[in-house]
Amino acid sequence: IYPEDTTVNFVSTLLEEFGDEWANKWMFHCRWARDIDQIASAGRIAQLTQPDASSEQLEELTEQVRQRMVGRVGFVGSNPETAPQIEASLHLALKQLEIHLESRPYLLGGRPSFGDFSLWGQLYNVWTDPTNCALIEAKMPSLLAWIQRMLWPRIEGDFESWESLKPTLKPFIKAQIGE
């Protein structure tokens, strides 16, 4: 998961850090910003924590989870003022990653990297909620394939050079992280 090439290894580490520090904002904001996503997510959490609960108990627990989590979106910097920026950042990232992943199975080539795992963890969860699931499944087949591939990642080739990654990965890095 650690490329030998120092530049590509740095990019992997940069993507890992980005996934932990910014992409979690996408997931958390989107999960708790809209009723449809709140209900779906809270329902999954309730079902996972109480698999033997009755329908009535699950409804009650779902609402408890929902109320608790919606009130926490501010912890990741999500509020009415920042919501448009968080969502615009996510939508641009999804488009950029779709383009980048059209020609390779993983972010840095033929095998998963440290960066894949971090970013995937957030985007997998973005995909499990109805609003963004509909977007990804309708318009982003390469990104969807990567999300699903990362459930059981395997080596399919080597890491690519920075020169081969740069045309489609640098725009993502520039827009999301900076120059």
Q: Model-derived features: where do they sit?
A:
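Short N-terminal edge-element motif at the start of the domain
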Residues: 73-107
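Intrinsically disordered or highly flexible coil/loop and linker segments, enriched in small
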Residues: 25-28, 103-107, 132, 156-160
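GST superfamily/GST-like fold recognition
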Residues: 107-127
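Active-site/pore-lining binding-face segments in mid-to-C-terminal subdomains
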Residues: 120-179
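Divalent-metal (Mg2+/Mn2+/Ca2+)-assisted nucleotide/phosphate chemistry catalytic cores
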Residues: 33-87
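Structural signal for well-ordered, non-membrane alpha-helices
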Residues: 20, 94-98, 151
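A non-catalytic, amphipathic alpha-helix used as a structural packing/dimerization or gating element
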Residues: 7, 11-15, 85-92, 96, ...
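GST-like domain detector, emphasizing the conserved glutathione-binding G-site
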Residues: 1-57, 107, 127, 179
